[in-house]
Amino acid sequence: MKRTFQPNQRKRKKDHGFRARMSTKNGRKVLKRRRVRGRAKLSA
């Protein structure tokens, strides 16, 4: 059986990167929540 995690930097950045988050209203909400929690890393 193929493993579910197939690492790919491009996919990672495109789906979970900072610019991807900033591009939608809900993505910005995610970043806001992470800032409130004090996360060291806001996005991938």
Curated annotation (Swiss-Prot):
Q: Which residues form the signal peptide?
A: none
Region Disordered, residue ranges: 1-44
Please give an example of a GO cellular component term from this record: ribonucleoprotein complex
Lineage of the source organism?
Bacteria, Fusobacteriati, Fusobacteriota, Fusobacteriia, Fusobacteriales
Write out the GO MF terms. Answer: structural constituent of ribosome
Q: Which family does it belong to?
A: Belongs to the bacterial ribosomal protein bL34 family.
InterPro entries associated with the record: Ribosomal_bL34, Ribosomal_bL34_CS
Q: Where is the composition biased (Basic residues)?
A: 1-16, 26-44
Q: Which species expresses this protein natively? A: Fusobacterium nucleatum subsp. nucleatum (strain ATCC 25586 / DSM 15643 / BCRC 10681 / CIP 101130 / JCM 8532 / KCTC 2640 / LMG 13131 / VPI 4355)
- Give UniProt keywords alphabetically: Ribonucleoprotein, Ribosomal protein
Q: Name one GO biological process term.
A: translation
The family database entries (HAMAP family) matched by this protein are listed as: Ribosomal_bL34
The name this protein goes by in its record? Large ribosomal subunit protein bL34
Q: Does the keyword Protein transport apply?
A: no
